[in-house]
A protein has these predicted regions:
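Hydrophobic helical h-region of N-terminal Sec-dependent signal peptides
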Residues: 12-19
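Disulfide-stabilized netrin-like
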Residues: 64-158
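C-terminal motif of bacterial Sec signal peptides marking the signal peptidase cleavage site
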Residues: 21-24
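Structural detector for short beta-strands of small beta-barrel domains
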Residues: 41-60, 66-69
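A structural connector/turn signal
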Residues: 32-35, 109
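Bacterial N-terminal signal peptides that target proteins for export
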Residues: 2-11
Length: 158
């Protein structure tokens, strides 16, 4: 085949499309659920952070849990009370992959930092005070309702 022949161009186009389709399908099928999400907690949800009420304090002197408000987008297992819930995250300035310590119990995930509007897939436990007895910053204290403990937090999709 000549280097610029129509057959060669068609052959290259077919191979390129075939490879692109294979890569596209691989990405779709590679979305496996994190086994920690599927096994930890009594509920698993996808939720969007409604707001972060203030800045997170530094972890210089003590460990704490910070309560964030989430809009529930989907409940994957278990149940939660309402379409908006309050979720406490342990030491939210630390990436979830390195946050666990001798005080927290098993917590973790793949979220690097928390920003309003982000979507997270989380394994949750309730009530908060059954899983965390340390400092709690809850700027929603006037709002009644369950406070959930975020056991595992990964980035999520709508």
């Amino acid at each position: 085949m000549a280097s610029n022949s129509p057959m060669r161009r068609i052959w290259i186009l077919v191979v390129t499309l075939w490879l692109a389709a294979g890569v596209s399908c691989e990405k779709r099928h590679n979305k496996q659920i994190d086994p920690e999400l599927a096994s930890l907690g009594s509920a698993e949800i996808t939720g969007q952070i409604v707001e972060i009420p203030g800045e997170f304090p530094a972890n210089d002197f003590y460990n704490y849990a910070y309560v964030l408000k989430y809009r529930v987008l989907k409940v994957h297992r278990g149940q939660v009370n309402g379409s908006e819930i309050f979720v406490a995250h342990y030491n939210p300035l630390k990436p979830r992959a390195t946050v666990a310590d001798e005080f927290s119990g098993k917590v973790g995930g793949k979220v690097e930092r928390f920003r309003a509007g982000e979507i997270h897939r989380m394994a949750l436990e309730e009530p908060l005070d059954k899983f965390w007895m340390g400092g709690i910053i809850d700027k929603y204290f006037e709002n009644k309702g369950t406070r959930y403990w975020a056991v595992w937090t990964n980035p999520g999709e709508p």
